[in-house]
Amino acid sequence: MDFLFIFNIPVYLLAISCSGGKKESADAGLELTEDSVVYLLADNVTLEIRAQFPFIDKDGHEYLTFQNQLEPEICVYDLQSGEFVKSIFFDREGANGVGMFGGYHIIGFDEIYLPSLQQSKVFVMEESGKKKREIITEKTDDGIPLLPFGAITFVYRPIYFNNGKMYIPQTINMRLGNKVMEKSPVYVVVDTVKNVLSPFPIKFPPIMSSDDVTKPSLGNELSYSCCLNDKDQFVFSFFFDEDIYVVSLQDGEMKKIKVKSRYIDKPAIKENPPQDFDGAMKASSEIPCYGNLIYDKYRKVYYRFVYLKADLDGEKNYLNIWQYGRKSFSIMILNEDFDVIGETRFPDFTYISTLHYIGKDGLYLSDSHYKNPSFDENKLRFRRFKLVHYNKK
């Protein structure tokens, strides 16, 4: 279930605490603090947020921004206080129209990148809603056709900028024929000055064969997440692959590193998946797999989300469960060398695993899950977790 589907849908872990997870024997863990930030939502904004990014302006002021799923709008809040700052609106049609866009990237309030979900292009917009220019992303310089894409955090793969180049994500491209797995680029490098596009040096790993891609599936088998560290390395996590892939921007060298969770066996793609909507949503929310991989630049660690096998028999709304980050998950902690130094399991139906951000003082994770007893549809709340090294001398 990837982004096109997504956008088409209108601790210290205390064993005695229902708010934390389970403390395990490890070198590091995530400790729940008493700190939280609450963002009050307008009536036309829902908690089914697909794109959410912190942003620091040129004066050093910190904001939390996210896309309104119901309107062509980016909501802007003060990161620390939770106070609403402003909304940035865009036209759907007309000279400055952007149609349907999936996510965004903010360089500054007068330089906002909106990837179109309908065309292979990126709109560069001002805060006023005026269109500055368009970046066409229809094909690479060697003729590979490209797809519209989303720059989102629900499945964490933003637009990245590095040394004057823009890096945009792609999904599996069925237009590439019987070698779709071998030929589909995962990311594409855009030289916006020379207007040259080239594939990034990584393809989809052999999670499925090109033949299997054409068969009935749940739609999330080839989902992946990507983060950029401060060593100019991209790190990829494919949801049905234990391994992560580290690619250097300096020389294109790629390293494959096994990073296994203690809570799940090797992820296995579901055979003969249900084709009815409820059945597919149930299966998607039950199957064990990996999730988002994010980099914490302040503590020089990575967090890899892991979805545990779940039994949802008796539940009623599988779509909601999936949209709110499933039932059970853990977060693996990796050091700079990609060694696993800890893994924290979180309580069921409490946190939204896809709503998170890195702050200077820790990892912020939303507990606005609709099954959480404290749930309020008008409030987006984040709890702060701090990284704890248990065996540090």
Question: Where do the model's predicted regions map?
Answer:
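Beta-propeller blade signature
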Residues: 181-195, 242, 319-337, 378-391
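Beta-strand-rich domains and repeat architectures in extracellular enzymes and scaffolds
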Residues: 41-74, 291-294, 301-307
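Loop/turn-rich, solvent-exposed surfaces of beta-rich toroidal or solenoidal domains
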Residues: 285-334
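A short helix->beta-strand "capping" segment at the edge of beta-propeller domains
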Residues: 25-50
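Conserved blade-ending motifs and adjacent loop-strand segments that build the rim/top face
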Residues: 95-96, 260-275, 339-359
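Structural signature of eukaryotic scaffold interfaces centered on beta-propeller domains
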Residues: 50-59, 102-107, 152-163, 217-230, ...
